[in-house]
Amino acid sequence: MSTSRKLKTHGMRRGKNRAPHKGVKRGGSKRKYRKSSLKSRKRGDDASRNYRSHL
């Protein structure tokens, strides 16, 4: 009884917490990461270009 009860509560809790948390984390981090990656990519290219030209 205790095992089945534990599994049921664990599964319900995991599913409930996992679905919304994953969605929010994915959407927010994806947008932020995309913007930052684009900016950092441009900066990295400029830095490498300047560094190479300097050398």
UniProtKB/Swiss-Prot annotation:
Entry keywords, A to Z: Chromosome, Developmental protein, Differentiation, DNA-binding, Nucleosome core, Nucleus, Phosphoprotein, Spermatogenesis
Domain of life assignment: Eukaryota
GO BP annotations listed: chromatin remodeling; flagellated sperm motility; heterochromatin formation; negative regulation of DNA-templated transcription; nucleosome disassembly; positive regulation of protein processing; sexual reproduction; single strand break repair
Skewed-composition ranges (Basic residues): 1-42
Predominant subcellular localization, coarse grouping: nucleus
One Pfam family in the UniProt entry: TP1
Distribution of this protein across tissues and organs: Testis.
Coiled coil start-end: none
Phosphoserine: residues bearing it: S36, S37, S40
Subcellular location: Nucleus; Chromosome
GO cellular component: a single term: nucleosome
One MF term in the entry's GO annotations: DNA binding
Region of interest called Disordered, as start-end residue ranges on this chain: 1-55
Keyword Nucleus: yes
Physiological role: Plays a key role in the replacement of histones to protamine in the elongating spermatids of mammals. In condensing spermatids, loaded onto the nucleosomes, where it promotes the recruitment and processing of protamines, which are responsible for histone eviction.
Similarity section: Belongs to the nuclear transition protein 1 family.
Protein name: Spermatid nuclear transition protein 1
Organism: Rattus norvegicus (Rat)
